[in-house]
Amino acid sequence: MKLIVAIVRPERANEVLEALFMAEVRGLTVSRVQGHGGETERVETYRGTTVKMELQDKVRFEIGVSDHFVEPTVRAILDSARTGDVGVGKIFVLPVERVYRIRTGETDQMAVTPGWPEEEPG
């Protein structure tokens, strides 16, 4: 099992969400966050004062998936979030030790994969 964390630009969030649903990825958390990556500095004027904007608005997706869903999930995010510009975002794939579904008490694969136990593809 893995936790996929993707940080994308807010203007690409709807496209990413749609691509994840099309890839049959279910069960995710979306948060508005701020961060700074490889973008150039942005300077704005506010009430006559020049302000250096060091943090950019971003959207964070957190998706717990079984191992066979990692590649389709990452591909959906890459294809929908990529613009070719600097600062588009990052995807992190992290190992997950244990998952519990609070409602049923199911654990691990049964807690993250809809319809489990079905035969895994491939």
Q: What are these model-derived regions, one by one?
A:
Residues M1-G122:
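Positively charged, small/polar-rich N-terminal and surface patches that mediate targeting and assembly
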